[in-house]
Amino acid sequence: SEDLPAAFRQGMIPFLIPLCLFLLFAALLKRDFPERMYLTLRGRWQRIAALVLAAGIFGLTAYCLIVKEDRTAVLYSLFYYVVFIGFGEEFVCRDVCTDFLRNAAWPVRYLVPNLCFAMLHLFERTGWGTVTGADLVRFLTADLAGLTVSGCLFQLFKERSGTIWLPVLLHALMDYSVVLTY
């Protein structure tokens, strides 16, 4: 946790894209923004599902704050995986991209944003360093299909639930569970 300011800056820079898109869409869509971007929680089952996922995140946080020595890293990871990763990736891939493709046939509406989602993970898979030809081949053969399918499942979850918050919380919980390995 001694280099958290640098880690925060590193996480914040890529998050500027979703943040700018969020502000741009909010300004352009005005009153239609929450509905069109699936930012509402309506109905009992949506709220219960969101509470269950949030409880999972906070339960994991409480556990890690008790058993882990570096509590600052646990709290930073909570913020990082919920805001930068969970919300950032879901908003860009599941809201912005699908909004642009809303009139496209379902295979296009599912494949294009989720191939983009998969490609967002290429640099993470290479340790944020230079991407070599071998890295690219390994990513294309080992990771691309799984990440694309998981993205499609997140999108299906968003469309069936009618809210972006359930995929955001599920994505955050899945990625945040890495704190167990610290």
Regions found by a protein language model. Name each.
Residues F58-L60, R71-Y182:
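Transmembrane helix-loop-helix hairpins at the membrane interface
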Residues S1-A27, Y76:
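Alpha-helical transmembrane segments in multi-pass membrane proteins
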Residues D3-I13, T40-Q46, V137:
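Interfacial loop-to-helix junctions that mark the boundaries of transmembrane helices
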Residues E2-A6, Y38-R42, L101-L111:
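Membrane interface segments of multi-pass transport proteins and intramembrane proteases
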Residues F15-L28, A49-L65:
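Hydrophobic core of alpha-helical transmembrane segments in multi-pass integral membrane proteins
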Residues P5, Y63-A73:
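Membrane-interface helix caps and helix-loop-helix hairpins in membrane proteins
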Residues F33-R36, C97:
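Cytosolic, membrane-interface loops and tails of multi-pass inner-membrane proteins
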